[in-house]
């Protein structure tokens, strides 16, 4: 690190020119990135339900409807001549559109009662579109304005899975702009307060923006190779600004500290990179390692955050280790130009020093009280119920949300989210009695409104519609499928729907079958995630432990860090269950509680928050170890380390929390949860954990903090990471 610092100090301008070229290239690409990202990807593509759904689509051309059009007669019934003519004309016109592969309607199916509302004033048109999710969004951009609205005979409103995702995508893009407009001015004001100099304050923000632009460039390249979720943009903005500012705070603060101690500018740059730069590097490794655990999951939504998160950490680290020191080398003492007040070097009278001393005089009560507080906050997590997002993630006033609410309210079954049961190797003609018997048993299950099959439609075990020409769509040469329509009171992504899936899969049948559809996706997604979570947690814990051991040569310090992080995250998740699952702040935060927490959000927040927690752990312990090596006094080292880093860690936490808090303004409920949860995790970790629990436990462990068994000590002596100041002494 010292050689890197010396190189930067001697060649700052070429490095700055290279940065400008990189930013210019990224600036050209960045505006086009969102159009190449997908809004789906919440399901496990390797699951039984996903594979069965793919085969149903291949054999029968059937899938969850991308468009669901509610057609309402202005007066009377949808069976009146004017409404019927309008409905048939709409069906014919939509069928002729480019990219529309299948259209069915109440009228084209000969007055199929399930597609008519209870009062007879409304009917449904169901359409499937071809292509990827992005292709469907482009089609919907044209089709929705063309087909929704009112004419002389009917009113038409559009919803459907792809239409909901299209509206979610538009909302995310709008929210990103708003979050940036809210966060950046506040960040600049807080940075001015921290550094008391406009030049010093602008540098971390600049590094954050470079990290965001660089990551967008990488994301565009990744999106050309694989599917990437549009929600990765939220992480790119949040962590790009947050970590860029975070890392830069420590670098700028150390540089100013070296200048205040009388170092020449080149020496100050070299020492800063060798000390604070080393800390930033290994903090970035810890954060990236946590985010890499997301690659263990097959869900595109989660993998996308790794695609964005790992590059954004790398870009923030690169900016703080190369671009920022190059700027500091050019600015020199000019960094404090127009400074309101110079910040005095930290001594032994600061607030954090006194807090550390107070805690270490009573370590056991503080450790016990802090642990109890975190456990109490985490208690609601014991009742967590996990689900997948649906239209209710949109704000109540969103068009897609309003139309889907109308669908729930006025129709007898949830046609847009039917469960599909596939039986292959079955001849529907010769196996008609078996098909009929199975359809009857399906229709008797609790939570099922109706079952459509090649043998007819059944409600409560009774034949509702006899088999006719329309029923032939459920039959192929060696396969058949059943459409299990849920009761409108049973949400497709609910615990009740999970019970229906379990009941369906437990039914005896004269043939093998598989279940597809949104409810089965939920069950299989949870099962697949639960199978991988232990591996992901173990990966994060092991990599964190090894990284901290290589840095500090200790066994207890990494163990303490992992345990405290898990405790802190449990408290955060408990708070999220209380707020979002139970809906206690739904009025204040303007969202609709669904009684569940989005499964992917929990996994995502764990990986990100764990990494950010290690960020502050590395910053604090690096300075504590530096003081311990200099004095040999554990208690003094902890107090001085907390005093030297407490103000900066708190400022960094406040700044990154502002970035996440800005996401609460999003209209998407799980983005609100993402922002609030990460903000709470960061603030709690930087205050309660670092300010109270860490010094308390380090006091209780005493000199054992830095102990390791003899073989591991020899390993660390040989392979451990050491830093050197410009003068060559180990710190």
Where are the predicted features?
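Short beta-strand segments
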Residues: 70-71, 126, 253
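Short coil/turn segments at secondary-structure boundaries
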Residues: 21, 68-69, 369-372, 419-422
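A short N-terminal beta->alpha junction/helix N-cap motif
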Residues: 12-13, 40-44, 78
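Membrane-embedded transmembrane helical bundles of large multi-pass transporters/channels
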Residues: 1-37, 100, 131-386, 518-731
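Structured non-transmembrane domains adjacent to transmembrane bundles in polytopic membrane proteins
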Residues: 46-65, 74-165, 383-586, 596, ...
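Disorder-to-helix initiation segments
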Residues: 38-42, 49, 238
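Short, conserved active-site loops that position catalytic residues or coordinate cofactors/metal ions
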Residues: 33, 66-67, 71
């Amino acid at each position: 690190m010292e050689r890197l610092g010396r190189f930067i100090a001697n060649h700052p301008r070429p490095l700055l020119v290279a940065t400008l070229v990189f930013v210019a290239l990224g600036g050209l690409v960045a505006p086009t990135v969102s159009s190449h990202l997908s809004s789906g990807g919440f399901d496990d593509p390797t699951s039984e339900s996903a594979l069965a759904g793919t085969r149903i689509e291949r054999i029968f051309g059937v899938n969850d409807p991308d468009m669901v059009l509610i057609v309402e007669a202005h007066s009377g019934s949808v069976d009146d001549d004017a409404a019927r003519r309008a409905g048939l004309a709409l069906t014919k016109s939509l069928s002729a559109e480019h990219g529309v592969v299948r259209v069915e309607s109440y009228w084209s199916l000969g007055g199929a009662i399930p597609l008519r509302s209870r009062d007879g004033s409304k009917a449904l048109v169901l359409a499937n579109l071809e292509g990827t999710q992005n292709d469907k969004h482009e089609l919907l951009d044209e089709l929705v304005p063309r087909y929704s609205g009112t004419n002389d005979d009917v009113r038409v409103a559009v919803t459907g899975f792809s239409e909901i995702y299209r509206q979610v995508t538009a909302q995310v893009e709008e929210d990103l702009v708003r979050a940036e407009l809210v966060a950046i001015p506040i960040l600049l004001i807080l940075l001015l307060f921290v550094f008391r100099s406009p030049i010093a304050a602008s540098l971390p923000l600049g590094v954050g923006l470079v990290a965001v632009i660089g990551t967008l460039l990488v994301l565009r390249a990744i999106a050309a190779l694989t599917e990437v979720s549009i929600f990765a943009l939220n992480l790119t903005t949040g962590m790009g600004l947050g970590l860029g500012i975070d890392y830069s705070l420590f670098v700028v603060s150390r540089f100013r500290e070296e200048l205040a101690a009388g170092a020449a500018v080149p020496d100050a740059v070299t020492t800063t990179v060798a000390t604070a730069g080393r800390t930033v590097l290994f903090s970035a490794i810890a954060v990236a390692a946590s985010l890499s655990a997301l690659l263990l999951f097959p869900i595109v939504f989660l993998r996308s955050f790794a695609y964005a998160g790992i590059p954004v950490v790398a870009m923030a680290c690169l900016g703080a280790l190369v671009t920022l020191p190059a700027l500091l080398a050019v600015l020199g003492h000019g960094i404090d130009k127009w400074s309101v007040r110079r910040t005095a070097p930290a001594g032994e009278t600061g607030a954090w020093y006194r807090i550390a001393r107070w805690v270490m005089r009573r370590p056991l009560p503080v450790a016990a009280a802090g642990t109890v507080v975190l456990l109490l906050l985490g208690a609601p997590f014991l009742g967590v119920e996990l689900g997948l997002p649906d239209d209710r993630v949109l704000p109540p006033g969103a068009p897609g949300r309003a139309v889907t609410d109308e669908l729930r309210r006025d129709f007898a079954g949830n046609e847009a989210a039917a469960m599909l049961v596939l039986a292959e190797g079955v001849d529907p003609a010769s196996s008609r009695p078996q098909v009929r018997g199975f359809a009857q048993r399906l229709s008797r299950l609790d939570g099922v409104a109706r079952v459509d099959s090649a043998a007819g439609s059944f409600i409560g075990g009774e034949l509702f519609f006899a088999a006719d020409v329309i029923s032939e769509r459920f039959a192929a040469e060696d396969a058949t499928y059943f459409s299990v329509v849920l009761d409108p009171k049973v949400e497709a992504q609910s615990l009740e729907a999970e019970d229906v899936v379990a009941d369906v899969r437990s039914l005896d049948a004269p043939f093998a079958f598989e279940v597809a559809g949104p409810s089965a996706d939920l069950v299989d997604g949870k099962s697949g995630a639960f199978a991988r979570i232990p591996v992901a947690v173990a990966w994060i814990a092991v990599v964190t432990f090894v990284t901290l051991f290589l840095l500090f040569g200790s066994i207890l310090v990494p163990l303490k860090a992992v345990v405290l992080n898990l405790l802190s995250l449990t408290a955060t998740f408990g708070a999220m269950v209380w707020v979002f699952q139970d809906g206690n702040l739904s009025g204040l935060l303007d969202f609709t509680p669904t009684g569940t927490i989005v499964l992917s959000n929990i996994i995502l927040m764990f990986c990100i928050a764990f990494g950010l927690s290690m960020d502050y752990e590395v910053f604090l312990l690096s300075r504590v170890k530096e003081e311990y090596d200099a004095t040999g006094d554990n208690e003094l080292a902890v107090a001085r380390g907390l005093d030297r880093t407490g103000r900066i860690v708190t400022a960094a936490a406040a700044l990154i929390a502002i970035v996440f808090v800005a996401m609460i303004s999003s209209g998407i409920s799980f983005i609100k949860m993402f922002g609030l949860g990460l903000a709470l995790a960061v603030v709690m970790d930087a205050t309660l954990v670092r300010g109270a629990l860490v010094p308390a436990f380090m006091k209780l462990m005493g000199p054992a903090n830095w102990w390791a068994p003899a073989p591991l000590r020899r390993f660390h002596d040989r392979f451990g990471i050491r830093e050197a100041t410009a003068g060559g002494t180990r710190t």
